[in-house]
């Protein structure tokens, strides 16, 4: 019996992700020994939900703390719902392309720190035993290019023991 190859597709909510899923669906259509894991990493909580102004009054401090907990929970629930919707759309695109649904899985994680995104993707690939990671790369204006790093470029630079596909 041939071992199944596993591909991890790292998705975000931009148009490039849809192109990535369509591309993978097109080139893997009909493959029997292939499994795909669709990954979306929820960004860290926004700073206003991580920082707490506090109070000198203990009761007020507890109240503010509870309110912050509720806001954090609400933000996380909304982010997870958006992630699930994104993953459902990607799953639909892949099944329409001929990928059997039993060969697909989804994974949602929340990042603690923006700088950990690359490591989070590698960790998910290792945990899910994926040999290939697929990411999209959209073009930036020259000015944004100076100040912004491409996730795809960082993955390629840091990759070891895993294949990286970059779809532009």
What residue spans do the PLM features occupy?
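Small/aliphatic-rich secondary-structure junction motif
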Residues: 1-71
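Structural beta-alpha unit
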Residues: 2, 81, 92-132
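Gly/Ser-rich helix-loop-strand patches that form or flank binding pockets
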Residues: 6, 122-168
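A structural signal for isolated positions on well-ordered beta-strands in alpha/beta enzyme cores
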Residues: 8, 35-37, 105, 132, ...
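A conditional alpha-helix N-cap/helix-loop micro-motif detector
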Residues: 17, 114-115, 148
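Aromatic/hydrophobic pocket-lining residues that form π-stacking "cages" and hydrophobic walls in ligand
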Residues: 24, 90, 121, 155
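Short glycine/proline- and acidic residue-enriched helix-loop micro-motifs
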Residues: 66-78, 104-105
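Low-complexity, serine/threonine/proline-enriched polar segments
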Residues: 74-89
């Amino acid at each position: 019996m041939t071992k199944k190859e596993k591909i991890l597709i790292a998705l975000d909510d931009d148009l490039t992700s849809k192109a990535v899923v369509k591309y993978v669906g097109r080139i893997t259509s009909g493959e029997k020994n292939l499994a795909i894991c669709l990954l979306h990493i929820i960004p860290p909580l926004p700073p206003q939900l991580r920082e707490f102004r506090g109070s000198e009054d203990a009761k007020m401090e507890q109240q503010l703390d509870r309110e912050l907990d509720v806001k954090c929970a609400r933000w996380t629930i909304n982010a997870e719902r958006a992630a699930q919707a994104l993953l459902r759309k990607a799953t639909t695109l892949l099944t329409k392309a001929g990928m059997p649904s039993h060969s697909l899985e989804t994974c949602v994680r929340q990042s603690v720190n923006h700088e950990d995104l690359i490591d989070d993707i590698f960790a998910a690939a290792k945990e899910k035993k994926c040999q290939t990671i697929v990411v999209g790369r959209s073009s930036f204006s020259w000015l944004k290019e100076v100040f912004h790093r491409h996730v795809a470029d960082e993955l390629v630079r840091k990759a070891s023991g895993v294949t990286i596909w970059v779809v532009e």
